[in-house]
Amino acid sequence: MQKGSEDTTQNRCHQHSIGGHSTCGLLLLIILVSWTSICEGAPFSSPVLGAEDELPLWNGIDDACSAVLPDPQLAVSSTLRELCFMVMRMQQKSQGEEKDDFKRFLFHYSKSHDSGNSDITSSVLHPLLQLLPQLHDRRMKRLTSDEEVQVPGGVISNGYFLFRPRNGRRSAGFR
């Protein structure tokens, strides 16, 4: 029974042959591509095809679709045309995503490294982080390094840290 159905399928494929390429061959090629792993999540290599086998397959699909799409006189079903358009869009989208990833990589990892000169601030830094050297200079002008400020309650401050003796003990300098 299956042999008869295979013969009718082959007859249909031979009826729709296009310049040496049959429509069934193109459909088979597109079905094989749909088995490859296309996902938005973690990378996963297909058990059916290796990475080196995918490029010739994509090139073959691209050639077949470019032979079918430009010629409106060919008797090709609208479903096949839509499938070719979908495959072409997927290919363009994946190339666009690779470009975006490359741009993102370059943005994060192309920061200029200073040669020890702390006066030069990088343009990649956040604007508030660029103010840190100025704040440090202002604080150093306000308080000298050996001067300690005494705050009521036994708190010693040198501008950066607060020191409070533990357990209520006070040093002799505070009495």
Swiss-Prot record:
Q: Which GO terms describe its biological process?
A: neuropeptide signaling pathway; positive regulation of smooth muscle contraction; positive regulation of synaptic transmission
Positions carrying Asparagine amide: N167
Q: Where in the cell is it found?
A: Secreted
Alphabetically, the GO molecular function entries are: hormone activity; neuromedin U receptor binding
Tell me the tissue specificity. Skin.
**Keyword Signal belongs to the record:** yes
Q: Which PANTHER family match?
A: NEUROMEDIN-U (PTHR15390:SF0)
Stated name of the protein: Neuromedin-U
